[in-house]
């Protein structure tokens, strides 16, 4: 009985030492710019990578109003960023201020 208790205690310690159940791996998400507008914004979690892809013929940016990112996107280019923390982040294009969107980043 004592040996079983030690084994269970060791397993419990190992479980908590590695952080419990595995957290979800960071995902790669894409936001496409086309026809002078940002495409659909996917569900995001802190740690995810966003690929901003400009399929338009015009130069754009994806610029956070809180200054957490500013992605320069010449025509037919793409750039990656990693979202660091949960919360809402409003963004826009510096060249075309009517182009706007919001990232809703979950923990």
Show where each model-derived region lies.
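Extracytoplasmic copper-binding redox domains, predominantly the cupredoxin/blue-copper superfamily
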Residues: 2-4, 8, 15-107
């Amino acid at each position: 009985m004592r040996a079983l208790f030690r084994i269970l205690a060791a397993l419990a310690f190992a479980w908590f030492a590695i952080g419990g159940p595995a957290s979800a791996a960071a995902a790669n998400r894409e936001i496409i710019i086309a026809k002078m507008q940002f495409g659909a914004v996917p569900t995001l979690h802190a740690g995810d990578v966003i690929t901003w892809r400009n399929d338009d013929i015009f130069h754009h940016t994806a610029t956070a109003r809180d200054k957490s990112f500013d992605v320069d996107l010449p025509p037919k280019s793409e750039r990656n960023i990693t979202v660091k923390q949960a919360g809402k982040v409003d963004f826009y294009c510096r060249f075309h201020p009517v182009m706007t969107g919001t990232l809703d980043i979950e923990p």
